[in-house]
A protein has these predicted regions:
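N-terminal auxiliary "cap/dimerization" subdomain that precedes the catalytic jelly-roll/cupin core
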Residues: 1-99
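N-terminal start-of-chain detector that recognizes signal peptides
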Residues: 2-6, 50-52, 120-126, 150-157
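A short linear-motif detector with a strong N-terminal bias
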Residues: 9-12, 58-59, 127-132, 157-163
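Short secondary-structure junctions and interdomain/linker hinges
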Residues: 32, 59-66, 123, 136-144, ...
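Conserved aromatic-histidine-acidic binding/catalytic patches
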Residues: 40, 44, 118-121, 168-172
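Glycine-rich loops and low-complexity Gly/Arg-rich segments
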Residues: 56-60, 104-106, 115-116, 175-176
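Signature of the catalytic double-stranded beta-helix
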Residues: 80-148
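Catalytic core of non-heme Fe(II) oxygenases with the double-stranded beta-helix
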Residues: 141-177
């Protein structure tokens, strides 16, 4: 496992946003915040946002599309997140698997993706995001927990005669409540 030092980052999710989102999740079961509001909730500068977004250029073609599509690009990684300790640990790299019940198109298949880029994982926004969400979930559950985050950023490319399908398997579900 690879422990990530998160103490050097000054980026943090605004505690008021964490609390208000946690309350909304407890009440409604979900929350939606527009991208601009997320950016402001982290005091994220435009330069930090742009530098993080550039990692989507380095995603690799998803070769596991049952529909033979060549429009989805991704990488994969999993982490243990301990918000109360401010600690994130990268777990050993392995395949991404979803059941057929959750993903009828690509389920029950071990899908191997390239790992997340080291600089993506080391970006201050990345750790601030995982720790902030972990704290939000702790508030929802009312306990300091350790969370397992399975993360697969992806990018859909559409071209003039080749449509991109954001979720060709149907409405997004990850099998986690």
């Amino acid at each position: 496992m690879n422990y990530m030092d998160t103490k050097t980052s000054f980026l943090r999710l605004d505690p008021n946003v964490v609390s208000s989102c946690a309350e909304a999740i407890k009440k409604e079961g979900w929350i939606f915040l527009p991208g601009k509001q997320w950016q402001e909730s982290f005091s994220l500068t435009n330069e930090e946002r742009i530098s993080f977004s550039l990692y989507w250029e380095g995603l690799e073609l998803d070769l596991h599309m049952v529909d033979n599509g060549s429009y989805r690009y991704r990488r994969y990684g999993s982490f243990e997140v301990e918000p109360a300790q401010g600690r994130i640990t990268m777990l050993p790299h392995g395949p991404y698997v979803q059941s057929k019940a959750v993903n009828p198109l690509n389920g029950d298949v071990e899908r191997h993706f390239s790992p997340l880029e080291n600089n993506f994982v080391a970006h201050p926004f990345f750790s601030a995001l995982l720790l902030g969400l972990g704290e939000m979930y702790n508030q929802v559950c009312g306990t300091a927990a350790t969370w397992i985050a399975r993360l697969h950023p992806y990018r859909i490319k559409a071209e003039l005669h080749v449509p991109g399908k954001p979720t060709p398997e149907g409405r997004h579900r990850d099998g986690v409540d």
